[in-house]
């Protein structure tokens, strides 16, 4: 199985400085995480899984100043159709769900405080759950999600 490598800056509590960490993810584990996640958009206690816009609006138009990630898979690269609540008859879009180096399943029904989702997300299609890739925040759990390498 493919190993995905994500770079993430994390603060060292001893020095209070950010350090670049290389995080490794097993694709089989990430696909299993997606497979076991509910097929819904933001309707769980934790709000995961939810729509990964990838720089698009719900009508499949690219938002100003955004560059969608190219996955190299036509199911994943197709501009989305996302109705207001994400369960329209012809909806198709990307979902994001937390994934971890140790492969454990995220507790999607954890309420406040929700389980820490960590920096990385498995991205897959709604409604068919086609695996697209793994993305991660570049600093802690904030900011844009970038495609990890594999």
Where are these regions (language model features)?
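Short, surface-exposed binding/anchoring microloops in extracellular/periplasmic proteins
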Residues: 2-58
């Amino acid at each position: 199985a493919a190993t995905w490598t994500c770079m993430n800056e994390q603060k060292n509590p001893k020095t209070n400085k950010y350090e670049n960490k290389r995080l490794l993810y097993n694709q089989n584990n990430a696909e299993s995480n997606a497979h076991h996640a509910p097929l819904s958009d933001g309707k769980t206690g934790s709000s995961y899984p939810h729509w990964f816009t990838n720089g698009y609006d719900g009508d499949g138009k690219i938002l100003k100043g955004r560059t969608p990630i190219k996955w190299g898979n036509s199911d994943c690269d197709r501009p989305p159709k996302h109705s207001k609540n994400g369960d329209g008859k012809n909806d198709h879009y990307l979902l994001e769900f937390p994934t971890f180096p140790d492969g454990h399943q995220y507790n999607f029904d954890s309420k406040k405080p929700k389980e820490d989702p960590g920096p990385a997300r498995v991205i897959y299609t709604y409604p068919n759950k086609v695996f697209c890739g793994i993305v991660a925040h570049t600093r802690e759990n904030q900011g844009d999600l970038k495609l990890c390498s594999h």
